[in-house]
From Swiss-Prot:
Phenotype upon changing residue 249 to Q: In HSD10MD; decreased 3-hydroxy-2-methylbutyryl-CoA dehydrogenase activity
Active site: 168 (proton acceptor)
Recorded consequence of changing residue 65 to A: In HSD10MD; uncertain significance
Role description: Mitochondrial dehydrogenase involved in pathways of fatty acid, branched-chain amino acid and steroid metabolism. Acts as (S)-3-hydroxyacyl-CoA dehydrogenase in mitochondrial fatty acid beta-oxidation, a major degradation pathway of fatty acids. Catalyzes the third step in the beta-oxidation cycle, namely the reversible conversion of (S)-3-hydroxyacyl-CoA to 3-ketoacyl-CoA. Preferentially accepts straight medium- and short-chain acyl-CoA substrates with highest efficiency for (3S)-hydroxybutanoyl-CoA.
Binding, substrate: 155
Name of this protein: 3-hydroxyacyl-CoA dehydrogenase type-2
Length: 261
């Protein structure tokens, strides 16, 4: 007999990058469906105000995902407030635009910029995964043997990186590459691991661009020909949580776009 799908109601989710964009949309959806959420974001991110807007079932945990101590403190806050951690959604990330070598300017991509993007996007994601897995491993398994769900955020840039995206594509490609082995690592203790690879979404990073640029980017999406709504990302997060047979896979959420150079 197939296992019953698990409702998000009553679950506790830690969401990195939770103060804005995809992370905030995820928190809004999960809290709206009866879950509790911990917004893990930088101290100056405005996360405290966002958590207050979401009510008593949401708290803010100021943290840098690259810091072991910060993430441990955030997880302790989650456990102290809500008793456990059932779900982790990794949305924290940064980007830089820089060619490997710019002939006109005579400039090379700095190692510092490359390292910083990998530190936040790839190392930060892994840091949260390894620490939250330890917390989830202490949960009592549900009737299907599940103790937790971890959902990471990659990007279509992991597959079709554009000019100037060497660092960003490398970081997101790393997330794609580690999804299956980590899912296999954690399968014996009942923790699922999934990754979403979004295309062009209406997050602050894009919506802050001139309207003409946003419209052009939206026109590149085959169908629907628009930017993705962060609520659609959040909807997929919920679907992954609720479907116990989704594991070890990367799902593109991109309106069929294939990025050009």
């Amino acid at each position: 007999m197939a296992a019953a799908c698990r409702s998000v109601k009553g679950l506790v989710a830690v969401i990195t990058g939770g103060a804005s964009g995809l992370g905030l949309a995820t928190a809004e959806r999960l809290v709206g469906q009866g879950a509790s959420a911990v917004l893990l974001d930088l101290p100056n991110s405005g996360g405290e105000a966002q958590a207050k807007k979401l009510g008593n079932n949401c708290v803010f945990a100021p943290a840098d995902v690259t810091s072991e101590k910060d993430v441990q403190t955030a997880l302790a806050l989650a456990k102290g407030k809500f008793g456990r951690v059932d779900v982790a959604v990794n949305c924290a990330g940064i980007a830089v635009a820089s060619k490997t070598y710019n002939l006109k300017k005579g400039q090379t991509h700095t190692l510092e910029d490359f390292q910083r993007v990998l530190d936040v996007n790839l190392m930060g994601t892994f840091n949260v995964i390894r620490l939250v897995a330890g917390e989830m491993g202490q949960n009592e398994p549900d009737q299907g043997g599940q103790r937790g769900v971890i959902i990471n955020t990659a990007s279509v840039a992991a597959f079709e990186g554009q000019v100037g995206q060497a660092a960003y594509s490398a970081s997101k490609g790393g997330i794609v590459g580690m999804t299956l082995p980590i899912a296999r690592d954690l399968a014996p203790i009942g923790i699922r691991v999934m990754t979403i690879a979004p295309g062009l979404f209406g997050t602050p990073l894009l919506t802050s661009l001139p309207e003409k640029v946003c419209n052009f980017l939206a026109s590149q999406v085959p169908f629907p020909s628009r930017l993705g709504d962060p609520a659609e990302y959040a909807h997929l997060v919920q679907a992954i949580i609720e479907n116990p047979f989704l594991n070890g896979e990367v799902i593109r959420l991109d309106g069929a776009i294939r990025m050009q150079p």
